Each structure stands twice: as C-alpha cells, then as structure tokens.
Amino acid sequence: MQQLNPSEISEIIKGRIEKLDVASQARNEGTIVSVSDGIVRIYGLADVMYGEMIEFPGGVYGMALNLEQDSVGAVVLGEYQGLAEGMNAKCTGRILEVPVGPELLGRVVDALGNPIDGKGPIDAKATDAVEKVAPGVIWRKSVDQPVQTGYKSVDAMIPVGRGQRELIIGDRQIGKTALAVDAIINQKDSGIKCVYVAIGQKQSTIANVVRKLEENGALANTIVVAASASESAALQYLAPYSGCTMGEYFRDRGEDALIVYDDLSKQAVAYRQISLLLRRPPGREAYPGDVFYLHSRLLERASRVSEEYVEKFTNGAVTGKTGSLTALPIIETQAGDVSAFVPTNVISITDGQIFLESAMFNSGIRPAVNAGISVSRVGGAAQTKIIKKLSGGIRTALAQYRELAAFAQFASDLDEATRKQLEHGQRVTELMKQKQYAPMSIAEMSLSLYAAERGFLQDVEIAKVGSFEQALISYFQREHAALLAKINEKGDFNDEIDAGIKAGIEKFKATQTW
C-alpha cells in the first residue's frame, strides 16, 4: 500500500483550499420589533436603502419606506399574519421588480405580477423595476398621432393623442369605467397594447370588466393588473406603478400602449393609510405631504418618446420608430367637487380632463360628457383630419345650446334664430349619445358629424335622431362600403370624400327609412 508523505498531504490540502470557491455573504440583518396592520418596525438593518426589498421568514417580503435613526418602517407585501416580534429580517439589496413582456397580454395579474386568473404560470422573459424615472425632456416628442376612443363626444371635442395624459373625472356610478373600457375595446385592431389597472375595486366588478374585454375580443392585447378592495393597502398603492412598468415595456421598444388607472382616488386613500400607520405627519384632508408626488411621478412616465430614445434603449435593435404610453387616469369626485385636494392635483398634472356630470347622466345623456368643462390641452394636434374638419361646430353648438336652454326657461316667446339654435343644439346633444360597448369607427363618426355640421338633421324629429344615425350608418355600410374603408384607412377629408358623403346622405334621406 502506497503511503503519502506529510509534504504531499500538505500540498494536496493547499491545492484544494486554493480551488475552493466560497462566496462570502455579508448579510445585513435586523430584528422585528413590532407588527401591526401590515406595517413592520425593524431594529437594525443599518445599510438598508429606501424602497429596498426586505426578506422575512417564510418567504414573505416587505418594502422599506421609513428610515429612522434606530429603526426601519417597512410595509409587508402580502400576508403578515405569520410574522411576529423577535423574528429576523434581512436586506436583499434589490428593489421591487415585476415581470414584463408580451407574455402578460391576455392575463390577469396582481400588483406583483403573479397570475390570478387560473390560466397557469406566466413565462415572462424579463423583469423590470416598479419605480422608474420618467424620460427626460430631450427624449420626448410632441403628441401628433390620435388614440381613437370610439366615442363621438370624446374624439370630436376632447381628442386624445398618443403619449397624452387625459383625466376622466366624475362622481361614482356615472360611466367613468365604461368610457375607459370602451377605449380599450376600440384598440383591438389598432395595434395599441393596453393595460387596465383596477385599484380598490370589488372583485366582482373586476371580473365583469375582464369578461366584457374577452367578449369583445380585446383581452388578447390587454394586461389586467388587479389590486382589489380585499387586498392590503400596500398592494393597492403599488398596482399603478406595476401596471405602468408593464406598459413602458412596449413604449421603450417603439410600440404604442394605453394604460387606464381605475382609480387613483383609491390609490391616494391607500397611500394615506400607509403614511398614517408609518406615523408620518398628516396634511390637508389627512393626506401626507407627498401625495402630489405620488401621482406626478406615475403620470409623468406616460409620454411619447423619440426615435433616438427607442434606438438607444434597444441598443440599435429598433430604429426609426417612436414609442408612446397614453394614460387615462380616473378620479372619483364627491358630489361633483373638482376642487378637492386629489382632483385638483391630478387636473394640474394631466394634459386635460373629460368631466362626466351627474345631471346629464340622470337625464339620459350618456356618455355624460360636459363639453364646457372638459378640455384636451394637446390632443388637437393629434386629431384625425376628417374629424377635426367636421367637428368644429359641435362644441360651439352644444355650448350655445346650454346657454340658451337656461335663458329659454324664462323667456316665453323666442325669435326664429334663437329657436333654430336651440333645436340644433338638442339634435347635436341627441347625436352625441352612444350605447356602451359600441365604439364607432372614424368613418361612422364622420357620417354623424357631417349630417349635423351640414344641416341634414334639421328636418329630422329630435326623438328620431338616434334611429336616423343607425339607419344612415347601415345604409352606407351596404351601399358605400368602399368609401367608408377609404375614410378609415386615410382619415383625410377632400372634395371627393365630401361629395361622396353628401350624395350618399341625400340618397338615404330620399328613402325615408328611419
């Protein structure tokens, strides 16, 4: 039997030691001091960073939000019932990330990107940070391409462009979600990817929205991020940022995306709850001092970015394409009070607002868009040419009608011109009505606007304006399908299209079939 001498043994041991590769892990650990209402106070964690993920026993994670002199206040992401005083907490050195990419389209996920629709796991190839800095001024482009919502009243009077932030504001149960969901349904063939973020809603309401999107063929290009009312305030606070990161994936690769936040009032309430539990000083309406920043840093991420930005981001893989993320935040008001704290904040951040009014909704005007208060600050440059040309008199007609209607209640005998204006206003108001889940194409909208603008509705009874419009569109779909296809394709308005629409409407009116 061969014997090793001591020098050989020491050489072998030395060689093994040199080859041994043990990465030393310096772990920053702390101890849980208290757990209450989803807020954990931790003693230690000297090197923790703001927003860093903290690991608790049992695979539960939290997020550091308060960095105090001798303790750290963290919010638990998920169930906190298993945590107790004296347990260990570890720094991870990571910030919160969620899965992103086309694999999420057609799925319903929670605020952390985990699937909750029972369709199996999501095999996302990439993840991205939930909190990101918005693109700088240099990388942005002005808004000049439209997002068609499919609503006449919005596309004609308050147009939305790609990369714009357009607020939808109004009381509860007034059609805010309906308007936003219809805008998503209208994108099913436009190539715009959509993200619907539900914050603090009933699970039955979210399930209903998902079902409607599926029925109308729009779920395949939509990601639904749900943080329902039964989930923790932390997840309701994070959901909009997670959804925004998922939408930015498409923006940064030269594609167009649309995101709906339904609604940011509930996110502000969730953030107020977290802040008060963290013992931060309350301000107006008990909201913390940084509630404006809460929404501004979210909404500034919606933008239209230049070709150079996309090229730089994709390392030259995508060239000559701009990307955009259009935001439709929703805010719920109390008794129409737009001067409350959160509504005024969001109005000042966004590029315009669509104001829905209870009185109009209750009188049967749906969508209940108040054309007087609603405005789009940048969408005009993005409006489709034919809609822009034909919708000029619509807003004026409605504004004059509302003014005269109030005046007409007191005056018994009206002159001919005033009476005509009133009747025209009534017909336009009737024409602006639209059923839910029935978005209109550019060509269909153009027919309605042309009929109103060129006086073809003057001899139509006010009660029959709706049926006249339906019959007119059906007639054109049968007899002038090529003209409609041409309008939808180009969106231009010239003498040839003008003559085509005029001749078609005149022939239709001769049939008297409405």
Curated annotation (Swiss-Prot):
Its EC number is 7.1.2.2. It is a peripheral membrane protein. GO terms for biological process: proton motive force-driven ATP synthesis. InterPro entries: ATP_synth_asu-like_sf, ATP_synth_asu_C, ATP_synth_asu_C_sf, ATP_synth_F1_a_nt-bd_dom, ATP_synth_F1_asu, ATPase_a/bsu_AS, ATPase_F1/V1/A1_a/bsu_N, ATPase_F1/V1/A1_a/bsu_N_sf. One of its GO terms (molecular function) is ATP binding. ATP binds at residues 170-177. It catalyses: ATP + H2O + 4 H(+)(in) = ADP + phosphate + 5 H(+)(out). Its main location: membrane. It is found in: Cell inner membrane. The record marks 374 as: Required for activity. One of its GO terms (cellular component) is proton-transporting ATP synthase complex. Keywords: ATP synthesis, ATP-binding, Cell inner membrane, Cell membrane, CF(1), Hydrogen ion transport, Ion transport, Membrane, Nucleotide-binding, Translocase, Transport. The keyword 4Fe-4S does not apply. Coiled coil: none annotated. Produces ATP from ADP in the presence of a proton gradient across the membrane. The alpha chain is a regulatory subunit. Belongs to the ATPase alpha/beta chains family. NCBIfam families: atpA, PRK13343.1. F-type ATPases have 2 components, CF(1) - the catalytic core - and CF(0) - the membrane proton channel. CF(1) has five subunits: alpha(3), beta(3), gamma(1), delta(1), epsilon(1). CF(0) has three main subunits: a(1), b(2) and c(9-12). The alpha and beta chains form an alternating ring which encloses part of the gamma chain. CF(1) is attached to CF(0) by a central stalk formed by the gamma and epsilon chains, while a peripheral stalk is formed by the delta and b chains. This is ATP synthase subunit alpha. It comes from Pseudomonas aeruginosa (strain ATCC 15692 / DSM 22644 / CIP 104116 / JCM 14847 / LMG 12228 / 1C / PRS 101 / PAO1).
